Amino acid sequence: MASGTIRLRTMEGIERPALATVMPRQEGHFVLIDAGANPSAKPEHLVHNAVLGSAYCQHVLGTENPRVGLMTIGTEEGKGNETTNAANDLLKSIPGIINYHGPIEGFQLFENVVDVVVCDGFTGNVILKTAESLFKCLFKDFLGGEIKKNPVRQLGYLFSKGAYDAIRTQLNPERYGGAPLLGIKGNILKAHGLSLIHISEPTRLGMISYA
């Protein structure tokens, strides 16, 4: 990413590019930005992330007037750290540019509260990898292990396999394997693990639209 940023340069007004990844939720999906490009961020960088994420969500994913939320530890005024509190004040001062919902907490991530979640790259990467690990533990280790313990549960699984497979497909991290680097004068898509080998139609369509 560093070499790509140097070669392609950042857009005017953008100091640091950010990784935007699409994640599933109760209804549809949301954009998480930054997902790991910059572990630390200044308040103005979070504002840039909000604008970039909102534009990506609207013009690439087709979400009309996307709601933008700032990840913090509480929705009350002053509940976050110095950076998020300052970023919150800045985001509230630019009405009309983005549809700013306000601060959100971790338990709201996968609810239909906002369409874009803004954070620094350290927080975003922890969220992303925790969600991926939880998917594996839930379906392969926890649920799969419990089903195998009892023949009655195995029979029940056969009747509910359609719903089980649909949820597993929706939550599978490989469906969301490509993360565009936003804020540069060009196209860079970051992928990890086997995500490019198993890249799905939603990700491919996102790549085409972004390009």
List the model feature ranges, each with a label.
Residues 1, 76-79, 108-111, 125:
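Short, active-site-adjacent cap segments at secondary-structure transitions
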